[in-house]
Curated annotation (Swiss-Prot):
Motif JAMM motif positions after renumbering to this chain: 171-184
Binding site for Zn(2+): H171, H173, D184
Keywords carried by this UniProt record: Hydrolase, Metal-binding, Metalloprotease, Protease, Zinc
PANTHER family: DNA REPAIR PROTEIN RADC (PTHR30471), UPF0758 PROTEIN YEES-RELATED (PTHR30471:SF3)
Official protein name in the record: UPF0758 protein YicR
An example Gene Ontology biological process: proteolysis
Pfam families documented for this protein: RadC, UPF0758_N
Length: 222
């Protein structure tokens, strides 16, 4: 009963002020629902965030790290992994229904949901039609911890196949630092030049780090 009483406060706060009013601890407590022996759910949520440093650290943790927290088992690990997957699928659907140019923040959130936590560099392309609506997106290349081989002709071939008119490029830096490298800038220039011959526009290249991003368009590089 104590756990349920403790959980009532975040619920009441959510109903009165909206879900965004909850702290990370309160939001995590809502999902955990119950604490462990001798520890209420709010205390447990607070300790978990302290152990992992942030929600990002928690949601991208492996089971070996997660099970090191006393009293936490596979059920709660599965709950939190389910939350992360729900968010990823939500942005997947939303991307198909909204124009990335009308909601650049949503586009970044989508890319973060797709690429955050990956241990290798992944190069993604969002393919858009002439109205800048999403046709599809693809993890078109994958590489190592700090490098991914990108071939512009493969991107163009896929764009032509699905009749795309514009592209948004994206890749992650598993190191966590989103600052583009010289190689990132060079491959972006190569892709843009190759696309120009086929009347394809590259609208942006977004690099995803740990809790940060860099947009080539916002920097004025595209």
């Amino acid at each position: 009963m104590k756990n349920n009483a403790q959980l009532l406060m975040p619920r009441e706060k959510m109903l009165k002020f909206g879900i965004s009013a909850l702290t990370d601890v309160e939001l995590l407590a809502l999902f955990l629902r119950t604490g462990t022996r001798g520890k209420d759910v709010l205390t447990l949520a607070k300790e978990m965030l302290e152990n992992f440093g942030s929600l990002y650290g928690l949601l991208t943790s492996e089971y070996e790290q997660f099970s090191g927290v006393h009293g936490i088992g596979v059920a709660k690990f599965a709950q939190l992994k389910g939350i992360a997957e729900l968010a990823r699928r939500y942005y997947n659907v939303r991307m198909r229904e909204e124009s990335p140019l009308l909601s650049p923040e949503m586009t970044r959130e989508f890319l973060q949901s797709q690429l955050t936590g990956e241990e290798r560099e992944i190069f993604m392309v969002i393919f858009l039609d002439s109205q800048h609506r999403v046709i599809t997106h693809s993890r078109i290349f994958s590489g190592t911890l700090n490098h991914v081989e990108v071939h512009p002709r493969e991107i163009i071939r896929e764009a032509i196949k699905i009749n795309a008119s514009a592209l948004i490029l994206a890749h992650n830096h598993p190191s966590g630092c989103a600052e583009p490298s010289k190689a990132d800038k060079l491959i972006t220039e190569r892709i843009i030049k190759s696309c120009q011959f086929m009347d394809l526009r590259v609208l942006d290249h977004i690099v995803i780090g740990r809790g940060e991003y860099v947009s080539f368009a916002e920097r004025g590089w595209i």
